[in-house]
Amino acid sequence: MPRNLVLFDLEWNIGYQPYTFNYHGVQQTFRGEIVEIGAVKIDEDANVLDTFSIHLRPRIFRKLQHHIAKVTGLTQADLDRGEPIVQGLRRFMQWCGPDAEFAEWGLDDVPVLKQNLFLCNLDESRPTVWYDLQQVFLREHPRKEGEGMTLESVVTRMGVPMERPFHDALSDTLYTADVCRLLDLRAGLAAYPTEDEALRQSLCQTPGDYRDFTVFHGYVEQYAWRADPKISQMPCPECGTTLQPDEIWLKKGSNSWYTLCQCPSCTGSSNAAGQGVFQRYKLSRRDGLHWSFARCAQMPDAESLARWEKLRTAQLERMRAKAEKQAAEK
């Protein structure tokens, strides 16, 4: 059975003030309200089979933000005469079909789509499968220094004829299809990592003795990885005893955390956990609504232990200085 591949692009409006909404008890910030959808159905050689284009009339951000108008060329009249957003989104998802695999240039649009579906009381569980076509492109054409990854820059670099405007949803989607026809799209999609594989690659980047990699999916609370014992409590990779984490957690990058744990049974022994075990986490909110938490243990060596002690000492000093400053301001 042929795959139902949908390339899509969204244009969305934003407000002059942030808008938050309640998602299953958790406040989330609205990324933007969709005002235009462009989509094409393609086969695995990126031949266009069907197209979809629609302007939507927003309900929340009704006034067109000036920056959005400048980038997209949309006018307030375009928004005002658009199809009501609930009706338009329902029609788009019906056109896609329940088995659709979505693809976009980047990973910005699916979270926006899912938030909009939820706020319109539509099923936000779809899509369940989607691809970042930038990653498929980079598999064949590794990025060189100074090269941009915007759709326009890649279209220029690949010599695709520029016969349509950019920042028009359907036009951008057709350009994406043009680029895909210059790739081995079948191989790129076949090699595309699952979310778990991508999290493993991110969490276990450097060489080391990593163990017990696990991913926990579907959480709406960002800090559930610290609060839920199922996620926060980890067994010792050597003996199975629950590890005891240090009071200090260090942040690495935007969404990675780690600490040095001790095993009550192994500490001081000659086995791999005798000097402690690093407990590592990588957080991801790929769909814009739910958090996934990747966790693993890393057995330390002399170099990583020395680096931990140095960074831990620096963190304690920052905490001490902050506490003294707050006390002085009272």
Q: Which residues are covered by each model-predicted region?
A:
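Metal-dependent phosphoesterase core characteristic of DEDDh/y 3'-5' exonuclease domains
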Residues: 31-37, 41-72, 93-219, 283-287
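Short loop/turn and capping residues at structural boundaries
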Residues: 18, 80, 128, 165-166, ...
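A general structural-boundary detector
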Residues: 26, 75, 79, 100, ...
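Acidic two-metal-ion nuclease catalytic site recognized across multiple nuclease folds
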Residues: 182-330
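Conserved non-catalytic scaffold segment of RNase H-like nuclease domains
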Residues: 2-111, 272-314
